Amino acid sequence: MDRNFLRLAVFATGPEHAADDAELFGAVAAQVEGHGRIGGVGAVQDDLAGQQVRHDRVHNLYGGSMTRAAGEAFADLRPGRRTLLYSRSSIIGSHRYGGIWLGDNHSSWEQLLANIQMMPSVQMCGFLYTGADLCGFAGDTTPDLALRWLEFGLFTPLMRNHAAAGTREQEYFRFADQLPALREMLRLRYALLPYLYSEFMKSALENTGYFRPLGFDWPADPEAREVQDQLLLGDGVMLAPMYTQNAAGRHVYLPGPMQLYRLRSAEDYDTEALPAGHHYVHCALNEVLLFVRPGHAVPLAKPAACTAALDEQPIALLACPDADGHAAYRMYTDDGETMDPEHDGHWTVLDASH
């Protein structure tokens, strides 16, 4: 590890932070026992304290400091403009500067389940802009796994297909048998962006939580507290992802009544009302299970090839009216470039009441 590289990462955050950085890094250095290469870990130099610091004692402080340095630099270079910044290595508090992805996972069904289970945890640490390597990073994926992972990944803020060198090429266009379904899932991602972006901003501005376990909303329900493979997405949606090979459906627990939408595309779906309780729900390989809670609605835009071309008018609504026939959604929109998230003009109420 090059010592100047580390010094740049930790201390390039501006002179006003130099004293804090020196104290923080000095505290890490004080824990170091010995110098030089120990266990194959390279030594790095703290020029301010004149001590050598092993990288295994710095760990995520290194990546977190790089994120901070880059975030503050972009803020100086592009004042008032947004920057897309995310890292693999980070520390608590780095969400103020950028997001993270979940690191080197493996192309397996077990890792898809782990991806589902990790999302609430990492977001409770403050990281909203996050996601896993879709299809898996290490090992060879399969067409079915690629499709099922995308069917969950299309709901994550960071949606990215990423693989290691030497593994099977896994760009979606390479899976000819699943290509029509993969294409529709990508289009569905864009159609759902009005909902996904609105819930992302609500979580950032109002601390509502983008992904949550069921027990957060039904804390008195012991069965809801035990569910580990279903997620709440914002205020109005529950997800029950498919994560088992060759499965034609799955068991789902509903703490309350919900409207199930079985989505094959943004335009092709069927729906049914389900009461609270345990259900076995069929789900074909090209389908996504989306449950809407009473009184809520999910806006769908016309799919586009990029966000700049996304047309939010007209908007369809996937609704679940409450006992009074009421369903609505509070949608957030902005220009996608400037930094003014709390302007009142960003909010629109969409009514789907009967």
What are these regions (language model features)?
Residues 290-354:
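Accessory, solvent-exposed terminal regions and/or long lumenal/extracellular loops of proteins
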Residues 14-21, 29-33, 45:
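Intrinsic low-complexity, disordered N-terminal segments enriched in polar/charged/small residues
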Residues 4, 18, 22-25, 35, ...:
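Intrinsically disordered, low-complexity regions of eukaryotic proteins
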Residues 1-7, 26, 30, 37-287:
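Catalytic-domain carbohydrate-binding cleft regions of carbohydrate-active enzymes
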Residues 23, 45, 101-105, 167, ...:
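Generic alpha-helical propensity signal that fires on short helical segments
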